[in-house]
């Protein structure tokens, strides 16, 4: 049975922020591509990072 990619990303919001921004910077054109590659719900990432007061900025392709 294949492991869900969600289990491969950090669950702690601050670690998730760092991981996500690094992936966006180095490998993906936008958040949608990142979420598709990791098979995770975009709304889940957005909500989790909003808990620590970060929002996705399309212009910079980062959570700021």
Q: Which residue ranges define each predicted feature?
A:
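N-terminal acidic leader/helix
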Residues: 1-25
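Short alpha-helical "recognition helix" segments of helix-turn-helix
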Residues: 34-35
